[in-house]
């Protein structure tokens, strides 16, 4: 870790566009990328591969501290690559089974602490784009630029609906909207690291904005802070 390397945190709820914006910005600047939300899935997947029980806090803590993972920003319109121990696991960690495992390991305090340190280790020159829910409030509270990206629940459900339909999945817009509202409530009401903007975050509502318009606003903030 290089504590002097600049960090841009991009937090926000599911479907706000933060992952897309983070990936494009990292690619544009040539900075490192951290998808913090994927780390719990990666840990659950890695634990299963190594025969580690998902309730064994000590072994999970050790695995978390040494996760060999790299996030590669994708070209526009494509998904980012997630490389675990040299293998592309971008798709396999998105299964329901891995997701259930991720929820289990995320409930263990020692694992959360180990992953907190692992996330901070991504901070290297020339800089880091950190995408998540508590990047600006918990993981990188000293980041020189913090962005909190949101959009209406209806717009986020619509985006997710189009994404899943594009993959050929049979989904209901109303059920997706219900899921997003339920997740928003869980994220904002949880006792540990609730979803909320940092006091010094730039808040952007992307409901009526294109990805390029969001990027333009962030570029302006970067220039004002002499970060690029």
Curated annotation (Swiss-Prot):
It comes from the Bacteria. Its EC number is 2.7.4.25. Pfam families: Cytidylate_kin. It is an enzyme of class 2 (transferase). This is Cytidylate kinase. The keyword Transferase applies. GO terms for molecular function: ATP binding; CMP kinase activity; dCMP kinase activity. PANTHER family: CYTIDYLATE KINASE (PTHR21299:SF2), CYTIDYLATE KINASE/PANTOATE-BETA-ALANINE LIGASE (PTHR21299). ATP binds at residues 12-20. Belongs to the cytidylate kinase family. Type 1 subfamily. GO terms for cellular component: cytosol. InterPro entries: Cytidylate_kin, Cytidylate_kinase_dom, P-loop_NTPase. It is found in: Cytoplasm. One of its GO terms (biological process) is pyrimidine nucleotide metabolic process. Keywords: ATP-binding, Cytoplasm, Kinase, Nucleotide-binding, Transferase. CDD domains: CMPK (cd02020). It catalyses: CMP + ATP = CDP + ADP; dCMP + ATP = dCDP + ADP.
